[in-house]
């Protein structure tokens, strides 16, 4: 499968594309995962979406298959402002070379390599390439411990910021995603295949 992946500021996307993204997020977060997130008119939208984030949208033809949100850590972001307990008392990152990844949503597809679908692996490669090309050193993200294990198996180099804690119905953990080591690992894996 070859997807069209676009990473751009919110204002670069058409209203229909944003509607599709927020609808997909509602379907995944409230519908499939059972998270307590605000859903308005069938769309999952939060205050961080008003901060001019960048989004990654993944399309297979005309169909939106997945998305990711990217926010700089110099302003408000989820780990710092919604899940500070996951920092274990540490100062939240505030650095132009560290951005937060959040709101990863994907249409379900069968698992492929390392427990992730081919589409997920493509999106990971694209988000790491984006950071590498922009000179970012790390992403910060909040995820589940199950996804953390899958990321590591897939070659994503992560560092825990704090200890795992219960957040809603999940066991969550805050992670740094180390860009250069991950870039090298993914590139080496690509050469080996």
What residues fall within each predicted segment?
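Short amphipathic alpha-helix that is part of the acyltransferase structural core
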Residues: 1-47, 55-57, 64
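Short acidic (Asp/Glu) patches
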Residues: 39-45, 49-52, 77-89
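Short, charge-rich binding segments
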Residues: 47-50, 57-63, 89-95
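Short beta-strand micro-motifs in enzyme catalytic cores
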Residues: 52-56, 97, 171-175
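Short, His- and charge-rich active-site/binding loops that engage polyanionic ligands
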Residues: 61-91
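C-terminal helix-cap and adjacent tail motif
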Residues: 173, 177-193
């Amino acid at each position: 499968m070859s997807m069209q992946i676009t990473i751009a500021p919110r204002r670069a996307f058409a209203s229909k594309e944003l509607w599709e993204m927020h609808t997909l997020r509602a379907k995944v977060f409230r519908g499939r995962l059972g998270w307590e997130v605000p859903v308005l008119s069938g769309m999952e939208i939060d205050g961080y979406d008003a901060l001019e984030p960048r989004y990654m949208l993944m399309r297979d033809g005309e169909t939106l298959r997945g998305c990711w949100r990217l926010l700089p850590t110099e302003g408000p972001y989820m780990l710092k402002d919604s899940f500070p307990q996951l920092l274990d008392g540490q100062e939240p990152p505030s650095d132009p070379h560290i951005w937060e990844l959040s709101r990863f949503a994907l249409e379900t597809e069968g698992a492929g390599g390392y427990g992730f679908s081919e589409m997920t692996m493509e999106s990971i490669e694209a988000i790491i390439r984006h950071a590498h090309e922009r000179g970012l050193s790390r992403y910060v993200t909040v995820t589940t411990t199950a996804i953390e294990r899958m990321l590591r198996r897939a070659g994503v180099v992560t560092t825990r910021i704090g200890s795992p804690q219960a957040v809603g119905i999940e066991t969550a953990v805050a992670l740094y995603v180390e860009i250069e080591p991950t870039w090298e690992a993914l590139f080496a894996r690509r050469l080996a295949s």
